[in-house]
C-alpha cells in the first residue's frame, strides 16, 4: 500500500508541472516545423581538449524538406571569436530529378581581397554547422524533467549525439542547449527566436 501511495504521489507531482506532460517533448520542438532564426552564444570544447572556446553566431534554418525537421537549408554567421568574425557556413539542399536532395556546404570568409568562398569537398566544414544542427530535433527523447521557475529540460539522444534543451516557462524556443558528440561539447544560450522566411529550398 505504501509503495502504491508513493507511486501515486510521484505521478501527481509530475502532473503538477503541466509543461512536463508527455506531449511537452513534442510540443517543445514545434518551432522546428518551420523556418526560424536565432542568436546563439556560448562555449565549445573540442574532443580531448578541456579548454572551452567562446563563440557567438546567428543561426538561420530553412523550411524542413519532406516533413523531416533535420533536412533543411542552414546558415551559421559568426560574430565571435575574432578569428571567425564574418565567417559564414551554409548548407544548401538542391532537389534532384529523382526526388532526392543534394547537400552542398560552402565556407565563406571576408578578406583584404574580397569575400572568399570555399565549397566543401567532404565533411570538413560540418563542425561549424553543429551549432545549427543542435537546434533540430534529432534522435529520440530520453528524458523530460522539470526545473525551477516552471521550466523543464528535454534530453534527446541518437546518431552519436546527446543534447539537453532547457525551456523556460512560456518560451517557444529553448533558452539553452548542451550538446555532446564525437567532436566535443557545446554549451550555448539561445535568444531572439523568430520565424524566418528565408532559406526555403525550392
Located regions from the model:
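An acidic-aromatic
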Residues: 60-131, 186
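Gly/Pro-enriched, hydrophobic low-complexity segments
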Residues: 73-79, 140-202
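Short, solvent-exposed coil/turn segments at beta-strand boundaries
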Residues: 31-37, 60-73, 92-102, 148-149, ...
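Sec-dependent bacterial lipoprotein signal peptides
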Residues: 1-18
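Glycine-centered tight beta-turn/hairpin loop motif at sheet-sheet or coil-to-beta transitions
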Residues: 50-54, 82-84, 111-113, 158-160, ...
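Charged, amphipathic alpha-helical segments
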Residues: 21-26, 86, 156-165
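Mixed-charge, Lys/Arg-enriched low-complexity segments
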Residues: 137
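N-terminal leader/targeting segments and the immediate start of mature chains
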Residues: 14-73, 81-83, 195-202
Amino acid at each position: 500500500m505504501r509503495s502504491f501511495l508513493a507511486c501515486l504521489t510521484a505521478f501527481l507531482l509530475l502532473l503538477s508541472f503541466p509543461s512536463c506532460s508527455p506531449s511537452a517533448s513534442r510540443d517543445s520542438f514545434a518551432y522546428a516545423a518551420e523556418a526560424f532564426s536565432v542568436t546563439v552564444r556560448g562555449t565549445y570544447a573540442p574532443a580531448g581538449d578541456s579548454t572551452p572556446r567562446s563563440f557567438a553566431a546567428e543561426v538561420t534554418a530553412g523550411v524542413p524538406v519532406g516533413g523531416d525537421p533535420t533536412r533543411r537549408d542552414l546558415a551559421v554567421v559568426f560574430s565571435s571569436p575574432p578569428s571567425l568574425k564574418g565567417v559564414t557556413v551554409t548548407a544548401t539542399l538542391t532537389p534532384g530529378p529523382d526526388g532526392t536532395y543534394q547537400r552542398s556546404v560552402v565556407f565563406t570568409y571576408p578578406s583584404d581581397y574580397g569575400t572568399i568562398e570555399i565549397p566543401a569537398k567532404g565533411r570538413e566544414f560540418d563542425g561549424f554547422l553543429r551549432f545549427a544542427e543542435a537546434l533540430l530535433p534529432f534522435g529520440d527523447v530520453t528524458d523530460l524533467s522539470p526545473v525551477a521557475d516552471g521550466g523543464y529540460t528535454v534530453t534527446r539522444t541518437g546518431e552519436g549525439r546527446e543534447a539537453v534543451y532547457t525551456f523556460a516557462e512560456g518560451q517557444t524556443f529553448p533558452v539553452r542547449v548542451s550538446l555532446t558528440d564525437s567532436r566535443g561539447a557545446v554549451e550555448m544560450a539561445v535568444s531572439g527566436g523568430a520565424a524566418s522566411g528565408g532559406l526555403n529550398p525550392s
